[in-house]
C-alpha cells in the first residue's frame, strides 16, 4: 500500500496544485465578500480543505472516465490509471473516499450549505462524462469549479443572494477561457479520439473566444466593484488581472502547445491578483 502511495498522489494531482488554486481563488473571493472581509477561521479552513479534497476527487473521477481516451493522448498516456499502474476500482474508491471526507467537513455548517454540497457533488461527479455530449464542456466545468461561491455565501449568510450567482457566471466565463487554453494543447489528439472541447467547437475563433470570455469575466467584476463600492486597492487588482489576460493573448495567439499551456497555468496569477484586490480593499476599509 505504501509503495503505491506516490501513484495515488499523482492520480489526484497533488504534484500539480494549479487546479486547486483555480478553484480556491473564486471561493476565497466569495468568503471575503460574503463576510465583509472578516471570514471566520473555521470557515477558511473548511473551504480550503474542501476545495483541495474535491479537486483531488474530481481528478480521480476524471481519470476513471477518460481512461480509454487518455492512452491516445501524449500528455496523459503515462497517468497512473491510464498506464495500468493502478486499477479502475482504486480510482473510484479514492474519489468516493475524498468526497466523503469533504462532506464530513461541512457537517457543522448550516442546512443550506449541506444541501448545496449535494448539488456540487453531482456536478463535480458528472463533469468528466460531459465531454461526450456537450460542445463546450468547459462551461459545465465552470459550474463545478465555482460552486464553492454559493456555498460560501450560504455558510456565512444562510442565504444565496443574486451577487453569488453573478460571481458564479463570472467563474463560468473564466473557466471557459483558461480551459480552452488547456484544450488547445491537446487539440490534435482530441480530434483523433473524438472528445468534445471548446477549442474544437470554437475552431479558428478559439483565440477570440478566449479573449471574449476574459472580457466577460472582468466586465462582471467591474459590475461587482461598482455595486459594492470597492476602492482603489480593488481596482489595482482588477487592472493587474486585465494585464494577465492581455499577456495570455501574446501566449495563445499563435496556437502553439507549450505557450498555450503556459497561459493556462498563468491563470493562477489572474485569480490571485483579483483576490488580493478584494482582500486588501477590506483590510484598508477596516482600519
Curated annotation (Swiss-Prot):
Cofactor(s) the protein needs: Mg(2+)
Species this protein is from: Burkholderia orbicola (strain MC0-3)
Function: Catalyzes the prenylation of para-hydroxybenzoate (PHB) with an all-trans polyprenyl group. Mediates the second step in the final reaction sequence of ubiquinone-8 (UQ-8) biosynthesis, which is the condensation of the polyisoprenoid side chain with PHB, generating the first membrane-bound Q intermediate 3-octaprenyl-4-hydroxybenzoate.
Family designation: Belongs to the UbiA prenyltransferase family.
Catalytic activity annotation: all-trans-octaprenyl diphosphate + 4-hydroxybenzoate = 4-hydroxy-3-(all-trans-octaprenyl)benzoate + diphosphate
Annotated compartments: Cell inner membrane
Cellular component terms (Gene Ontology): plasma membrane
Membrane topology: Multi-pass membrane protein
Stored CDD domains: PT_UbiA_COQ2 (cd13959)
Alphabetized InterPro entries for the sequence: HB_polyprenyltransferase-like, Prenyltransferase, UbiA_prenyltransferase, UbiA_prenylTrfase_CS, UbiA_sf
A GO biological process held by the record: ubiquinone biosynthetic process
GO molecular function, one term: 4-hydroxybenzoate polyprenyltransferase activity
Full protein name: 4-hydroxybenzoate octaprenyltransferase
Metabolic or biological pathway: Cofactor biosynthesis; ubiquinone biosynthesis
Amino acid at each position: 500500500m505504501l509503495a503505491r502511495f506516490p501513484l495515488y498522489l499523482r492520480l489526484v494531482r497533488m504534484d500539480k496544485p494549479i487546479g486547486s488554486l483555480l478553484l480556491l481563488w473564486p471561493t476565497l473571493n466569495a468568503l471575503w465578500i460574503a463576510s465583509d472581509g472578516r471570514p471566520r477561521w473555521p470557515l477558511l479552513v473548511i473551504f480550503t480543505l474542501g476545495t483541495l479534497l474535491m479537486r483531488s476527487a474530481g481528478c480521480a473521477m476524471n481519470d476513471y472516465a477518460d481512461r480509454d481516451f487518455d492512452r491516445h493522448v501524449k500528455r496523459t498516456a503515462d497517468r497512473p490509471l491510464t498506464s495500468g499502474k493502478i486499477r479502475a476500482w482504486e480510482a473510484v474508491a479514492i474519489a468516493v473516499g475524498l468526497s466523503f471526507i469533504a462532506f464530513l467537513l461541512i457537517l457543522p455548517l448550516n442546512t443550506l450549505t449541506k444541501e448545496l454540497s449535494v448539488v456540487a457533488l453531482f456536478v463535480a461527479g458528472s463533469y468528466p462524462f460531459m465531454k461526450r455530449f456537450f460542445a463546450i464542456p468547459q462551461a459545465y466545468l465552470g459550474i463545478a469549479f465555482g460552486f464553492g461561491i454559493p456555498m460560501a455565501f450560504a455558510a456565512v449568510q444562510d442565504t444565496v443572494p443574486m451577487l453569488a450567482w453573478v460571481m458564479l457566471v463570472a467563474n463560468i466565463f473564466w473557466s471557459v477561457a483558461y480551459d480552452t487554453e488547456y484544450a488547445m494543447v491537446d487539440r490534435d489528439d482530441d480530434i483523433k479520439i473524438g472528445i468534445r472541447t471548446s477549442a474544437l467547437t470554437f475552431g479558428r475563433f478559439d483565440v477570440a473566444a478566449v479573449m471574449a470570455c476574459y472580457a466577460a469575466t472582468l466586465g462582471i467584476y467591474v459590475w461587482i466593484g461598482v455595486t459594492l463600492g470597492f476602492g482603489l486597492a480593488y481596482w489595482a487588482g482588477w487592472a493587474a488581472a486585465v494585464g494577465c489576460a492581455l499577456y495570455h493573448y501574446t501566449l495563445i495567439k499563435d496556437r502553439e502547445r507549450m505557450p498555450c499551456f503556459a497561459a493556462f497555468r498563468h491563470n493562477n496569477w489572474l485569480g490571485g491578483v483579483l483576490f488580493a484586490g478584494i482582500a486588501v480593499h477590506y483590510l484598508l476599509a477596516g482600519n
